[in-house]
Amino acid sequence: MYAVFQSGGKQHRVAEGHTVRLEKLEVATGETVEFDQVLLVADGETVHVGAPLVEGGKVVAEVVSHGRDEKVTIVKFRRRKHHDKKMGHRQWFTEVKITAINA
């Protein structure tokens, strides 16, 4: 059984037991989170596709950890002007483990 749900403006395909990195959620480590924006649920032969959401669909997950991704380097450069600017960005994430998928 797997599901596609939406969180943080992105869609994630998950099954029970999977660990997924999502955009940062303001939830403490060890707590459970419910995602109700379920777009698709597939269980063996049957596939429930929402229009746009599956009615009664829910993905339950447990927050494993919070952290930051690897640094992305940004370089701005102006030719012939002896001007360059180097910056970096590290995005916060929340790692969750999927515990249940309900259709």
From Swiss-Prot:
Keywords: Ribonucleoprotein, Ribosomal protein, RNA-binding, rRNA-binding. It comes from the Bacteria. The keyword RNA-binding applies. GO terms for cellular component: cytoplasm; ribonucleoprotein complex; ribosome. One of its GO terms (molecular function) is rRNA binding. Disulfide bonds: none annotated. GO terms for biological process: translation. The keyword ATP-binding does not apply. Belongs to the bacterial ribosomal protein bL21 family. This protein binds to 23S rRNA in the presence of protein L20. Part of the 50S ribosomal subunit. Contacts protein L20. This is Large ribosomal subunit protein bL21. It comes from Shewanella woodyi (strain ATCC 51908 / MS32).
